[in-house]
From Swiss-Prot:
This is Probable alpha-L-glutamate ligase. Its cofactor is Mg(2+); Mn(2+). Binds 2 magnesium or manganese ions per subunit. ATP binds at residues 141, 178-179, 187, 211-213.
Length: 301
């Protein structure tokens, strides 16, 4: 097969591993810079152009779309969909998962376990907003943040009020969530491919750090999932309509709660922690499912 990887970083671990895994299985792989693609969207014959030429037909496209280029990146993915190319994660599913508020609303509607979450623009009663999610300590998140950036822990009511007021002053959209203390600064990243969890790791935040992101100095190790955790991850991926994703889960007293569904999960940490060929499993999924015009909208909302 001829496979395209949409990525701005050909040297990034995940991009390199996907390319290596596909080539090892005899496929032709092209790494394409998403922002350098351009399109004639009114043409009766949809195409994507790159470096002055029309791109050849690809049997499959693997989108590795960074959060900062979601709008343009999903437009490029959508153009490939119009051409009948099989895409690993479709454009609407990527957009759905990138909107933290929208994704939480959709997961909540389907009964997925979530931390109590508040959303407001300019509340006339900040104290009530904080009380409504269980009171301090609370976690305050920027809707546009990634890799733990824009996530702060407010340990007292006064600190929480001050932080919320500060974000409001910047006209920033924020989520206010209950702090799951019993998780102990750890979360579980479940890698879902084709409707099943193929790998899972426990990420532990650095000492004194409540965020478990590996980019923030956290560590990772192999973890055994419970049946409930596995089912939660699979259902969350299905609701988002994603074929390949990372589902981040916290172990709360009441059961697993989903923090985020990542449509472009990094492979380095989970491959090292589990020793599994995750990239190879993604390529295997493509081999089994890539057919022309097979992409269809999954998930709702």
């Amino acid at each position: 097969m001829r496979i395209a990887i949409l990525s701005r970083g050909p040297a990034l671990y995940s991009t390199r591993r996907l390319k290596e895994a596909a080539e090892l299985r005899g496929h032709e792989v092209h790494i394409i810079d998403t922002l350098h693609c351009y399109m004639d969207i009114t043409s009766s014959k949809p195409a994507v152009r790159y470096d002055g030429e029309e791109l050849p037909y690809f049997d499959a496209v693997i989108p590795r779309i960074g959060a900062s280029i979601t709008f343009y990146g999903t437009s490029v993915v959508r153009q490939f969909e119009m051409m009948g190319t099989f895409v690993v994660n479709e454009s609407v599913a990527i957009s759905r998962s990138r909107d933290k508020l929208r994704s939480l609303q959709l997961l909540s509607r389907k009964g997925i376990g979530l931390p109590r979450t508040g959303f407001a623009n300019k509340p006339d009663n900040i104290k009530d907003l904080i009380r409504n999610v269980g009171g301090a300590p609370v976690v305050i998140k920027l809707l546009e943040g990634t890799q733990g950036i824009g996530v702060v822990l407010a340990e007292t009511p006064k600190t929480a009020e001050a932080m919320i007021e500060a974000f409001m002053g910047l006209k920033a959209n924020i989520l206010v969530q209950e702090f799951i203390k019993e998780a102990g600064g750890a979360d579980i990243r479940c890698l879902v491919v084709g409707g099943r969890v193929i790998a899972a790791m426990k990420r532990q935040g650095a000492e004194g750090e409540f965020r478990s992101n590996l980019h923030r100095g956290g560590s990772a190790e192999l973890v055994r999932l419970t049946k409930e955790e596995r089912a939660t991850a699979v259902n969350a991926a299905k609701i988002m309509g994603l074929n390949v994703c990372g589902v981040d889960v916290l172990r709360a007293t009441r059961g697993p709660v989903v923090m985020e569904v990542n449509s472009s999960p990094g492979l380095e940490g989970i491959e090292y922690a589990t020793g599994k060929d995750v990239a190879g499993m993604i390529v295997e999924f493509i081999e089994k499912n890539a057919r022309p015009h097979r992409t269809k909208t999954r998930g709702k909302g």
